């Protein structure tokens, strides 16, 4: 059983994955709040409480974090609490199998890399990956499995909260799909702007990528969405073909499998 840990700015997803290769399957997953000052001990208590007796079945662990301080604590946690379990953390120097054809590869977020890896491996084609998180990342992977870059926009909830915070007449609202794009009250107006507005933003970016990037104008390009906020706008997206809620966890599994032998040798050497 593989323990997968996906730490983002707002929330963290913890998953347990059985099998490998094409037989890999996310058996359980949990979503918890990310705390930037969390300690390794606190992480261990939380994760051990979530996975319970399955902790005895762990054969590996893989993790990423868009919060550098938490990545350090994840490393300490794995080394102290599961020292016999080989682990891989997505950071510079780790083999991902995805060439990064960008100006500064070290700037590319680990989440973006593993998402593109998972999409390329799963669908076997060039792909556009849309991750709906605290930011919306629209990333591009070529038919050769190369990361070509992408676009980043503020996330749906972040934008709605910012509008409420910067305006005396607006307040924070629950983001659900409104009955119409023409709101009849302030809450519906904000919901319409968020849901329909961001659907249009994503469709616009995907269409622009298809127009501007060589080889992306045909039907052999897969467009896949992931992320906790994706279901909010899926119904109104015309460009997205697939929704894969576990894309990042699958990507972590793929990177672990690529680096597994090296990690086992390191554990044995100790």
Swiss-Prot record:
Its main location: cytoplasm. GO terms for cellular component: cytoplasm. Pfam families: Pan_kinase (PF03309). It catalyses: (R)-pantothenate + ATP = (R)-4'-phosphopantothenate + ADP + H(+). One of its GO terms (molecular function) is metal ion binding. InterPro entries: ATPase_NBD, Type_III_PanK. GO terms for biological process: coenzyme A biosynthetic process. It is found in: Cytoplasm. It is an enzyme of class 2 (transferase). Its EC number is 2.7.1.33. ATP binds at residues 6-13, 134. Substrate binds at residues 109-112, 186. A monovalent cation. Ammonium or potassium. The keyword Glycoprotein does not apply. It comes from the Bacteria. Its cofactor is NH4(+); K(+). Pathway: Cofactor biosynthesis; coenzyme A biosynthesis; CoA from (R)-pantothenate: step 1/5. Homodimer. Belongs to the type III pantothenate kinase family. Catalyzes the phosphorylation of pantothenate (Pan), the first step in CoA biosynthesis. This is Type III pantothenate kinase. It comes from Mycolicibacterium gilvum (strain PYR-GCK) (Mycobacterium gilvum (strain PYR-GCK)).
